[in-house]
Amino acid sequence: MALGLGALSLLSGCCMPSYVESARPAAEDDAMSRPFLAPLILTEDPLQDAIVRVVGSVSCTGTLISEDLVLTAHHCVVEHNEKGEVVHRDLAPEVVHVELGGDDLPWGDVSVRAIVTPACGYEQGDGDLAILVLDRKLVGMPTFTPRLTQAPEIGEEVSPWGFGRCALSSRAVRRESRLGGKIDRVTSGLFNAEASICPGDSGGPVLSRSREVVGVISASVMDTDPRTRGRSHFARLDKYQQLFSAAQEIAAGRSASELPPFRSCEGTPQPGRTAKAD
């Protein structure tokens, strides 16, 4: 639904994907069995190349947290009915792919072979995170470290990143560092800060000053201006350590059915203050 100038809405930061024609290898099975090799020259800050686009039924943002795992938002990889309403069911992995590069003209495209999610967060909020298991390792690509053993802290400065675009953005879709701020509220599954978020930023990393991923962009109050800070909601990672462990096991070749239960939304968050800041 289009936003009028100055109108505010609480939206998840997704947008419809652009169409990208992908070249297919002549010997697809053989090519898919080989690891992906990153180009020799990436961006001036190579770590930024770990922030990628996630494209399924909508277009979102994700973060490489290992050579074959991408962290994003759960609501970015769920099914919708014919009315566009969220169905509490994940997309098939083959419907989702990851685009590499800093804008809407990717230099690489990688398929997904498994989607690891909690049994909540289908629309936004607590549990709004998903880990995509890629069909090949991205050898040579930089990765970010998710902070799983320390809770977000009130007063901690955070910076969101994403591939979103607001109506008044002067540039085409590209990787952007958003205006962030200090965390002012922490609950059992979320934390909040005033930040500038655009549609398409959902799933993007929320980075600490030490450049660890402390959360995932879930939802925000947005208008048409990318410089406007609004009330933003970020999903905590530390509550879902078992989800990250399961994703690593699945990436290593184990079946999800072989693993202990990992989709529970009754995780164990690390201790943190939950009162609103003064």
PLM regions: where:
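Catalytic histidine site
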Residues: E44-L91
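Active-site substrate-binding loop(s) of clan PA
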Residues: H80-R89, R113-E123, L134-S169
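C-terminal subregion of chymotrypsin/trypsin-like serine protease catalytic domains
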Residues: M16-A27, I65, L69, V77, ...
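Active-site region of chymotrypsin-like
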Residues: I41-C60, D135-T143, A167-E249
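Active-site-proximal beta-strand/loop segments in catalytic clefts of secreted hydrolases
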Residues: V55-S57, I65-E67, A73-H75, L100-G101, ...
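C-terminal motif of bacterial Sec signal peptides marking the signal peptidase cleavage site
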Residues: L11-G13
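Conserved catalytic-core segment of clan PA serine endopeptidases
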Residues: A27-L47, E85-V139
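Bacterial N-terminal signal peptides that target proteins for export
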Residues: M1-G4
